[in-house]
């Protein structure tokens, strides 16, 4: 223990203001005593841990008097060094000020706590191993203990008896003090654990606050960069792109159908299909060569591997374009086959209509021939009727009426019934007048 410096130590309650921190030049430290922060000032480079414990116990005894609860000697206590969840008991002769300065920037995260030695560690690490007493079973005498006591002088017997009674009294006192010490150790252990739990809860709250601050900062950055609805847009953009892609494909199909309606649509479509097929074959060959070359070059060095990765990415993009073009070509081919089937169907319909037209023409010609034969028979009958006339000449009126009848019957589609009846009555009247 240092010969001086202990009497200069003073303790006081720390100010609860969170903004005030310890000044290392003031040569003072903060020690937790039963959930209270106490400042120990007047430290020197020779001040040890046991000096600080003695000063704290004296201040506690002066403050509480008979109601004090820190009982025992300074050697029964120790100062525990706590840092970020780890703990270490300081030996009694630790230079406390040197240790405090050694922490440097980590001083705000380090704390000193006064605890009972037995509550923290039953066997402190700084104690050396004590010599074990091995009882010698071999007795140097052959007599019994009672007979041996009788052989001793009276004064020595009295000393042995007094010593025995003193030992018994000490054993009784140690038993009562041991029970009391056990209770004190239990109380200090509970207090220390409660203090540790409070520290852990406080640390968890601080971490939660830091996490919330980081999340808020990230949210503000995303809002500043992508807008307030960046989450909504992030989930809807893929769907919108899919819809736009579908609309583009539909527009291409419609454009292709419109092109097919033109006279040169079929030829252009065939040229496009041939071009795409040639392009696919060419790109497939290039892809195979590039893949083989990239595999061989990638084994040689890292730069070649990076170049191969870039080429592979380009090849993948080209493959995607080829797949898209192939799908479009297949769609166009399917539409082309459908249009070809429609054209064949239209040709078959035209052929059927042509055959029907030929049949109708034949029927029309046959009807026209039959009508001509009927007209000639009627002319012959008229001539035979006019032959018995006296002068053998046809009157002009009769000839004019016969010409009218001939013109009326020379129709390929026939005459209406009313018109034919009127013509027959007129002819009969004319014949009667002529006779």
From Swiss-Prot:
Residues 1-22, 371-397 are annotated as: Disordered. One of its GO terms (biological process) is signal transduction. SMART domains: RA. Residues 195-291 form a coiled coil. It is found in: Endosome. One of its GO terms (cellular component) is cytosol. CDD domains: RA_RASSF9. Residues 25-119 form the Ras-associating domain. Residues 375-386 have a biased composition (Basic and acidic residues). Its main location: other. Keywords: Coiled coil, Endosome. Residues 388-397 have a biased composition (Polar residues). The keyword Coiled coil applies. Interacts with PAM. May play a role in regulating vesicuar trafficking in cells. This is Ras association domain-containing protein 9. The lineage of its organism: Eukaryota, Metazoa, Chordata, Craniata, Vertebrata.
């Amino acid at each position: 223990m240092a010969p001086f410096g202990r009497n200069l130590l003073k303790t006081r309650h720390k100010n609860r203001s969170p903004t005030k921190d310890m000044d290392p030049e003031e040569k003072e430290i903060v020690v937790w005593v039963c959930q209270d922060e106490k400042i120990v000032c007047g430290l020197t480079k020779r001040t040890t841990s046991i000096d600080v414990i003695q000063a704290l116990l004296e201040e506690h005894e002066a403050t509480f008097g008979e109601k004090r609860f820190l009982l025992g000697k300074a050697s029964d206590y120790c100062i525990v060094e706590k840092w970020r969840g780890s703990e270490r008991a300081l030996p009694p002769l630790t230079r406390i000020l040197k240790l405090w300065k050694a922490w440097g920037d980590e001083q705000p995260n380090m704390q000193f706590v006064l605890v009972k030695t037995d509550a923290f560690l039953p066997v402190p690490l700084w104690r050396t191993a004590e010599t074990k007493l091995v009882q010698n079973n071999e007795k140097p005498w052959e007599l019994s203990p009672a007979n041996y006591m009788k052989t001793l002088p009276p004064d020595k017997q009295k000393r042995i008896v007094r010593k025995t009674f003193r030992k018994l009294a000490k054993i009784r006192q140690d038993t009562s003090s041991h029970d009391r010490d056990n209770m004190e150790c239990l109380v200090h252990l509970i207090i220390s654990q409660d203090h540790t739990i409070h520290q852990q809860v406080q640390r968890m709250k601080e971490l939660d606050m830091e996490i919330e601050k980081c999340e808020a900062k990230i949210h503000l950055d995303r809002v500043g960069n992508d807008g307030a609805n960046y989450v909504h847009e992030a989930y809807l953009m893929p769907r919108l792109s899919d819809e736009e892609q579908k609309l583009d494909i539909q527009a291409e199909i419609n454009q292709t159908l419109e092109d097919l309606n033109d006279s040169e649509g079929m030829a252009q479509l065939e040229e496009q299909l041939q071009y795409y097929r040639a392009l696919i074959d060419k790109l497939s060959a290039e892809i195979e060569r590039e893949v083989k070359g990239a595999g061989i070059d990638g084994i040689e060095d890292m730069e070649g591997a990076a170049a191969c990765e870039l080429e592979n990415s380009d090849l993948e993009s080209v493959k995607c374009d080829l797949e898209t073009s192939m799908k479009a070509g297949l769609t166009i081919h399917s539409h082309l086959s459908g249009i070809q089937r429609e054209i064949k169907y239209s040709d078959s319909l035209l052929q059927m209509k042509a055959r029907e037209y030929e049949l109708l023409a034949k029927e029309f010609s046959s009807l026209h021939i039959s009508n001509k034969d009927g007209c000639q028979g009627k002319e012959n009958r008229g001539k035979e009727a006019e032959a018995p006339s006296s002068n053998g000449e046809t009157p002009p009126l009769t000839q004019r009426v016969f010409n009218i009848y001939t013109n009326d019957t020379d129709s390929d589609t026939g005459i209406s019934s009313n018109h034919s009846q009127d013509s027959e009555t007129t002819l009969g009247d004319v014949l009667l007048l002529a006779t």
